[in-house]
Design a protein with these regions (language model features):
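Basic, alpha-helical interaction scaffolds
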Residues: 403-472
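Conserved pre-catalytic core of RNA-dependent polymerases
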Residues: 79, 97, 103-311
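Surface-exposed loop/turn segments and immediately adjacent short secondary-structure elements
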Residues: 39-181, 186, 190, 194, ...
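Catalytic palm subdomain of template-directed nucleic-acid polymerases
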Residues: 257-273, 346-370, 475
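Arg/Lys-enriched, amphipathic patches
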Residues: 1-66, 117, 441, 459-466, ...
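Active-site palm subdomain of RNA-directed nucleic acid polymerases
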Residues: 199-217, 300, 318-349
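Short, conserved micro-motifs composed of acidic
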Residues: 363, 378-411
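Catalytic palm active-site di-aspartate
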Residues: 79, 125, 164-167, 183, ...
Length: 617
C-alpha cells in the first residue's frame, strides 16, 4: 500500500511540475506575443532581477523595524525630513524676460494629445484611476476635461486630492537597511498630470522663444540628453589633450536637491522668467499645502505635509527644478571655466595651463558655494570629486567650503565611467561584465527554450547595457571591439539549434546585426541629428560642413563634413572625428537625407561594410 501511495504521489508531483512549466511557458509567450515593449521589459526585469522586497529598516535609535506600517512611517518621516524651512531671505534676482506668460489655453485637442502620451500600463494615482481609463475614454472626456482645466486655471487653484501623493520608496545603492538609501517616487492623480502636460508644453514654448533655459542644461529637455551632455564635455577634453594641455574637472553632488527647493525662492525666479497672472497663481497653489504618505506593501503611512521641494513623479516638477537651478550656469558666462548640467548633476571644468587656471577654478567653486547657500541647496561634500584629465604638473587641492575634494582617477558621469586619460577601459569592462550577468540570467531563468523568446529578452534587457551613450565611448582597439562583441557571440551560440553555426551565419539567421555595426549606425544617426539641427544646443558645434569652409566638393552628397588633423588617438577616434569618413562616403542621393525616419530606413538597408572597410564584424 505504501508503494502504491508513493508511486501515486510521484506521478501527481510529476504532473504538477509539468503543469507549472506549461503555465509558465504560456505566461512567457503571452507577454512575448504582445507588441508592448514596456510590458515585456518589466516582465523580463521581474524574472531576472535579483532585487528582493523591502527588508528591515534601521531607525534612528539603532532598532530594527520590520512591520509594513512601521517601515512606511519611518521612510515617510525620513523623506519629509529632507524638506527645508525657508530662511525668509529674498535674494536679488534680475528680471530676465520682459514679456509675460499669464495663461494656458486648454482645448479638447490639446487635452486629447496629452492623453495619447499616457502609458497604457502606467500606475494610477491616489484616486485609483489608472491611465488606461483615460486612454479608453479619451474621445468622451477630452471636452469636459478641457473645461475643468480651464476653470482651475482661471481661479489659480487645484483640488486638494490633486496635491496629495502616494510615495513608493525606490532603492538606490548602499545598505538596504538605511532609509537614506531610498528615493521617493510620487504617484499623483492622472488627471492632474494631464493638466500639467498641457501647461509644460506651452510654457516650454514660451521659455524657448525667449532663450530662458541655459544651453548647458541637458536635463528633461527635447533635443538634449545625457549623451549630448557627455559629448560636449568629452569633446572639450579631447581637444585640450590634443593641444598638450590638461583639464581640471569638478563633480558637485547636491543632497536631495528636488526636495530642498524653496517655494518662495522658486516663485521669485518664475516671475523673473515671465511667468505671471493665472499661470503663476496656479503654480503657487500647486506647490502649497501638499501632502504625502508612503506605501510599503499594502500599508500606508500617516499623512505628512511637504513644506519645500518639487514633486518627483509629477510632470511639471522637472521643469520647475530646471528653472530653479537654471541661473547657476550664468556664473560661467564670462569665464574660461565651463559648466554642464543634467538636472541637478553639476560638473565644471577648465583647461589647465598654469596655477592661475587652478585659482580660477577655485574661484568658481567659491561662487558655487555662495550660490548654493543663497538658494538653500545643500552640497553633499563626501560625494563631490575632482579629477585631472590628461597629464599635468599643476596639482593642487580644490576646496568646497573648506572641504578638500577627493581626488579621483575615474568617475561615474551620467552612467558612463570616465577615466583620467579618456580611454574608457574601465567603463567597457563594467558594461561587458554586467551584460554577461544578464545574458546568463536569461538562459537560466526562462522556462521556454524558444529562440524568439530568448532573443527578444536579450535585445531588450542586455543589448541596451552595451549601447548606452556609445557615441561617447565607442572603442577603436580591436581587443575591446571583440570584448564587447563576445557577449552577443556567446549568447547566440547557446541558442537551441545554433550551436554549430558560425557567428556571421547566426546573425543572418536571427536577423540581427553585430554590435560594432550598430554602434556605427548610432554614430551616423546622431550625426544626422546634429547636422540637421535636431539637437538644439552646443553639440551642433561638433561638426563643420565642407561647404562653409570653401572646400571643393566634386563628388558625394551635399552634407559632407570637414575633417581635422589630430595628434593623439583619443582625439582621432572621438565621435566627431571617427564618423566623418563614413558619413562623407554615404551615397550622394539627397533623398536619403530628407528626414530622420527616411535616413534610418536607408541605414537599415545599406551594407556599411562596403563603405567602412575597417569593420571587423
Amino acid at each position: 500500500a505504501d508503494t502504491i501511495a508513493l508511486d501515486a504521489y510521484r506521478n501527481a508531483e510529476k504532473q504538477c511540475r509539468q503543469l507549472l512549466i506549461d503555465y509558465e511557458i504560456k505566461r512567457e509567450n503571452r507577454v512575448i506575443d504582445s507588441d508592448n515593449t514596456g510590458s515585456f521589459f518589466r516582465f523580463v526585469n521581474g524574472k531576472l532581477s535579483c532585487k528582493r522586497g523591502l527588508g528591515a529598516i534601521n531607525d534612528d535609535k539603532g532598532g530594527v523595524v520590520t512591520g509594513d506600517v512601521e517601515r512606511a512611517n519611518l521612510l515617510n518621516d525620513y523623506f519629509t525630513s529632507m524638506c527645508v524651512d525657508d530662511d525668509g531671505k529674498t535674494p536679488a534676482f534680475d528680471q530676465v524676460v520682459s514679456e509675460n506668460l499669464e495663461n494656458i489655453h486648454f482645448t479638447p485637442e490639446t487635452v486629447h494629445a496629452a492623453i495619447k502620451q499616457l502609458k497604457l500600463g502606467g500606475a494610477g494615482g491616489p484616486d485609483g484611476f489608472p491611465p488606461r481609463v483615460f486612454k479608453k475614454l479619451a474621445v468622451c472626456i477630452k471636452d469636459p476635461l478641457s473645461l475643468i482645466f480651464t476653470s482651475f486655471m482661471s481661479v489659480g487653484q487645484l483640488p486638494r486630492d490633486w496635491k496629495h501623493a502616494v510615495v513608493t520608496p525606490v532603492y538606490k545603492s548602499g545598505a538596504a537597511s538605511s532609509a537614506s538609501n531610498y528615493r521617493p517616487i510620487s504617484l499623483t492623480c492622472v488627471a492632474c498630470k494631464l493638466m500639467e502636460r498641457v501647461i509644460v508644453k506651452q510654457t516650454l514654448g514660451f521659455l524657448r522663444k525667449h532663450g530662458v533655459i541655459n544651453a548647458h542644461q541637458h536635463g528633461f529637455l527635447s533635443g538634449r540628453s545625457t549623451t549630448t551632455n557627455l559629448l560636449e564635455s568629452v569633446n572639450d577634453w579631447t581637444l585640450a589633450i590634443n593641444d598638450r594641455k590638461s583639464v581640471g574637472a569638478v563633480y558637485i553632488d547636491y543632497k536631495r536637491a528636488f526636495d530642498c527647493v524653496s517655494h518662495s525662492k522658486l516663485l521669485l525666479k518664475l516671475r523673473s522668467y515671465g511667468i505671471s497672472g493665472q499661470l503663476f497663481n496656479w503654480i503657487a497653489n500647486f506647490l502649497q499645502n501638499r501632502t504625502q504618505q508612503t506605501r510599503v506593501g499594502s500599508s500606508l503611512s500617516n499623512i505628512t505635509d511637504l513644506t519645500s521641494g518639487v514633486v518627483q513623479g509629477s510632470v511639471i516638477g522637472p521643469l520647475l527644478f530646471v528653472l530653479f537651478i537654471n541661473d547657476v550656469a550664468c556664473l560661467f558666462n564670462d569665464s574660461s571655466c565651463v559648466c554642464k548640467l543634467y538636472a541637478d548633476d553639476l560638473k565644471l571644468y577648465t583647461v589647465l595651463e598654469s596655477k592661475v587656471d587652478c585659482d580660477k577654478l577655485q574661484s568658481k567653486l567659491n561662487e558655487i558655494c555662495v550660490w548654493s547657500d543663497t538658494w538653500q541647496l545643500k552640497i553633499s561634500y563626501k560625494k563631490c570629486n575632482f579629477m585631472y584629465i590628461g597629464n599635468t604638473d599643476c596639482r593642487v587641492n580644490m576646496l568646497l567650503n573648506d572641504n578638500v575634494l577627493q581626488l579621483v582617477s575615474d568617475v561615474k558621469d551620467l552612467g558612463v565611467t570616465v577615466d583620467a586619460h579618456l580611454t574608457f577601459n574601465k567603463h567597457i569592462d563594467q558594461v561587458v561584465a554586467r551584460a554577461f550577468i544578464r545574458s546568463n540570467l536569461i538562459h537560466k531563468c526562462f522556462v521556454s527554450r524558444d529562440v524568439p523568446t530568448l532573443l527578444r529578452a536579450f535585445l531588450v534587457y542586455v543589448r541596451p547595457v552595451l549601447e548606452y551613450a556609445s557615441c561617447v565611448w565607442s572603442p577603436y582597439h580591436v581587443e575591446q571591439i571583440k570584448q564587447i562583441e563576445s557577449v552577443q557571440k556567446r549568447f547566440t551560440k547557446r541558442l537551441k539549434g545554433f550551436e554549430t553555426h558560425d557567428y556571421k551565419s547566426r546573425m543572418s539567421l536571427l536577423g540581427i546585426e553585430s554590435l560594432e555595426i550598430r554602434r556605427l549606425k548610432q554614430d551616423l544617426i546622431f550625426t544626422y541629428k546634429i547636422v540637421f539641427g535636431l539637437v538644439n544646443n552646443a553639440a551642433s558645434d561638433l561638426f563643420t560642413l565642407t561647404s562653409s569652409v570653401n572646400v571643393n566638393r566634386t563628388r558625394g552628397h551635399a552634407y559632407k563634413l570637414f575633417p581635422h588633423q589630430n595628434r593623439i588617438d583619443v582625439r582621432k577616434h572621438f565621435f566627431s572625428e571617427r564618423v566623418i569618413n563614413t558619413w562623407n562616403s554615404l551615397p550622394a542621393e539627397t533623398k536619403h537625407f530628407s528626414s530622420l525616419p527616411v535616413f534610418k530606413r536607408f541605414l537599415r538597408d545599406v551594407d556599411l561594410r562596403k563603405i567602412n572597410k575597417t569593420l571587423i564584424f
